[in-house]
C-alpha cells in the first residue's frame, strides 16, 4: 500500500507494512549512532514521525526527464547514504511498519511512528531560500517562494478550509435553486468607479477588452434574460492602489434575485448564508436578524460606514448644539472619561498627530478647567458658547479628555478623522489595559443602510459621483430630490459589516430605463462618449426587465475571517505584492516587440524609462 496522504485514522494500520510518500521535514534528531528520528509531511500538511534504526540503502528512482549524467552522479554519491543525509524538503517514499509511539511520547495528532525499512528518493530539493513555516525571511522572499511556503501545515490548512467554505457556498445556493452562471471575463470598459485592467484585441486593432471589476452589468442582464435567481463565485479585477487587505484580482460571492424590490429580501438570504458558514467554520450560531443602522448613524456615532460595534467610545455630532456656521461643515467630538488616568497628554497629542486633519485635544483634570476647556479648542474659541451647557449634554467632567475636529458634511471617503482616531484610541487603551481585549471569536455583524446615493468628487469636470455604482435605485421617498438635491437622495444600498470589516455591499437596482438614463445623463452628467458605454444596459432595461437586486460578498475577506488568518494574503494561493507583482512567476513582464505589433500596441519612451 502506497499512500501520499495519511489516513484520518491510522490505528487500523498499526503493525502493517506501508509505504508513504511525502516531503522530508527539516527537523531531525540523532539519539545514537544507529537511531535517528525524522519527520515526513504529506499533501495535507500532516506530520508523521519516522524512526530509523539501521543504515538504509537509499534507492534512487529514475525519472525519464532526468539526464543519465545527472542520475549517475547522484547515484554514485548516495547509494550508501542514510535518511539523515537526504536534504530537507526532498520528496521521498518511505516503507516500514507503522507502530504506536510510546505512551509517554504520544500527543494529539502525533501518536504514531513509522519504523523505516526502506527509502526511495523521488526528487531531491536543492538551493531552497526558505523552509515551510519559516517566517523570518522578508515578505518578498516568502512570496517568491510561495510554493515552498504553501507546504507548511498552516498555509495548507488555510487553502483547504477556503475550499471547504466554497463547497458550502455552492451547496447553499443549490439548495435554494439559484442558477450558477459564469459571466465573461472579457468585458468592455465602462466608467463604474475603479480603474480597470485592459486587454488589447488582436482581431480588432485599436480596441480593447476590460477585465470586469464585478459581474454587475452581466448579472443585471441575466435578470432580464429570465434566469431568476443567479449566483457565482466570481473572479474580479481592479487596477487600484493596493493595501494589505486588497489584491488586484480577487474573488466574490456574487448573487442577484429577480422580482425583488425591497432590501430585506436580499438581506435574509445573505444572513442565512453567513449563519451557515459561521456555524460550519466556527461552530457558532449567529442570532438573526442582524442589527441594522443607518449610514448617518454609523458616521455620527462611529465615524465610519464600516463600524466596529464591539466596543463603545462613541462620537457625537455637535453641529446642532453650536451657533450656525457653514452648512457644509460638521463638528464631531469624542469624549473619553479617563478615570484611571491611563492616557497622558503626550499620548493624546500623538493620537491627533497620527490622524492629522486638524484634530485637536484638551484634557480636563481640575474643576476650574470645566469652564475654560472650550477656549483651548480652535473650533470653539471664537464661538459664543456656554461651557456648562456642553458639559451637561456631552457628560464632560473632571478627567474627561475631549477630541474634536471639523469635517465636511458630505464625505468623500467612508471614515471621518475621529472615526480613525477612535480605532487608534481603543488599540492604545487595550495595550495599556485600560480596556479589556476584544473576544477573538466575537462576530458582530451589522447592516448599514440608507447610504447617500451620490457623493462629492474631487474631479474638476464632475461635481458628484455615485457612492457605489450608477445602477443603485434611489430610495422611494427621495426620488423627487434627484433633480434639485441629489446629495440628499438616499440609495437602496446595504453593506454587511463585521468587526469593522466591510464584507460586501449590494442594492436594489434601477430597472426603469428612464430613471437609469436620467441618473447617467442629468445627475452624473456623463459626457456623450461615456454615456454611450451604457447603451447596451439601457436597451436591456427597455426590453422588459423585472425589478431586481443583489449583493457581492468578498470571499477572500470572509475566508480570512472564518479561518482566523491574519489577512487575505494567507487565504489566496498566489497573492500579489503591494505593487501588483507575482514574485514567484515574475509577472507582470515585458512582451516581445513583435507580439506588441500583432496587438497594434506601442510602448512609449516615457514608459520604457519608467520601467
From Swiss-Prot:
SUPFAM superfamilies per the record?
Class II aaRS and biotin synthetases, Nucleic acid-binding proteins
Q: Which GO terms describe its cellular component?
A: mitochondrial matrix; mitochondrion
Where is L-aspartate bound in this sequence?
Answer: 192, 238, 509
Q: Can you cite a GO biological process for this protein?
A: aspartyl-tRNA aminoacylation
Q: What InterPro entries has UniProt attached to this entry?
A: Aa-tRNA-synt_II, aa-tRNA-synth_II, aa-tRNA-synth_II/BPL/LPL, Asp-tRNA-ligase_1, Asp/Asn-tRNA-synth_IIb, AspRS_core, GAD-like_sf, NA-bd_OB-fold
Instruction: List the catalysed reactions.
Output: tRNA(Asp) + L-aspartate + ATP = L-aspartyl-tRNA(Asp) + AMP + diphosphate
Which superkingdom heads the taxonomic lineage of this protein's source?
Eukaryota
Q: Does the keyword RNA-binding apply?
A: no
- Keywords in UniProt for this one? Aminoacyl-tRNA synthetase, ATP-binding, Ligase, Mitochondrion, Nucleotide-binding, Protein biosynthesis, Transit peptide
GO MF annotation terms? aspartate-tRNA ligase activity; ATP binding; nucleic acid binding
Q: Where in the cell is it found?
A: Mitochondrion
EC number(s) in its UniProt entry?
6.1.1.12
Region: Aspartate; residue ranges are 216-219
Where is ATP annotated to bind?
A: 238-240, 502, 554-557
Q: Transit peptide: which range?
A: 1-30
Q: Which family does it belong to?
A: Belongs to the class-II aminoacyl-tRNA synthetase family. Type 1 subfamily.
> Any idea what this protein is called?
Aspartate--tRNA ligase, mitochondrial
Its lineage opens with: Eukaryota, Fungi, Dikarya, Ascomycota, Taphrinomycotina
From the UniProt record, report the name of the gene that encodes this protein.
msd1
